[in-house]
Amino acid sequence: MSSKRAKAKTTKKRPQSATSNVFAMFDQSQIQEFKEAFNMIDQNRDGFIDKEDLHDMLASLGKNPTDEXLEGMMNEAPGPINFTMFLTMFGEKLNGTDPEDVIRNAFACFDEEASGFIHEDHLRELLTTMGDRFTDEEVDEMYRERIDKKGNFNYVEFTRILKHGAKDKDD
């Protein structure tokens, strides 16, 4: 009897596998945005994101990532990264228990020194020229009271505020 139950259970779970269910996690416009992001990263247009694609994409943004950093990014995937895997990885991250990490890691892609800061001019350029482009006014609003004296944006603190709210500060 227990083998029948196990068999029935396995059959029930099959339709809910990550590849078939991942497209149901997002609406059509979100999937389109992910596709645009995937295509931006897939520099050689072979339908897969590999280490060279990541390197070329980051180099196009003025970054020179180390081999170790690239390996770390690639090791987050259990196998080759085609669009379905890319979407699955984002789906798992976005529906995970700590979306704060997802946001922080998105900023960290542009923080070569892993300092927790991105210079305001560089971040403004990225935000106004890539993906869902921000207007200068939207960037100004995001920067309000968040740029230090050296002109750096503290994305670690910004992410914390996004997820947990601002702490009261006595200036």
Swiss-Prot record:
It comes from Rattus norvegicus (Rat). This chain binds calcium. Disulfide bonds: none annotated. The modification N-acetylserine is found at residue 2. The gene is Myl9. It is found in: Cytoplasm, Cytoskeleton; Cytoplasm, Cell cortex. The lineage of its organism: Eukaryota, Metazoa, Chordata, Craniata, Vertebrata. Phosphorylation increases the actin-activated myosin ATPase activity and thereby regulates the contractile activity. It is required to generate the driving force in the migration of the cells but not necessary for localization of myosin-2 at the leading edge. Phosphorylation is required for myotube formation. Phosphorylated by DAPK3; DAPK3-mediated phosphorylation is inhibited by LUZP1. Keywords: Acetylation, Calcium, Cytoplasm, Cytoskeleton, Metal-binding, Motor protein, Muscle protein, Myosin, Phosphoprotein, Repeat. Smooth muscle tissues and in some, but not all, nonmuscle cells. Residues 1-21 are annotated as: Disordered. It holds the Pfam family EF-hand_7. This is Myosin regulatory light polypeptide 9. The modification Phosphoserine is found at residue 20. Its main location: cytoplasm. Residues 29-64, 98-133 form the EF-hand domain. Residues 1-15 have a biased composition (Basic residues). The keyword Disulfide bond does not apply. One of its GO terms (molecular function) is structural constituent of cytoskeleton.
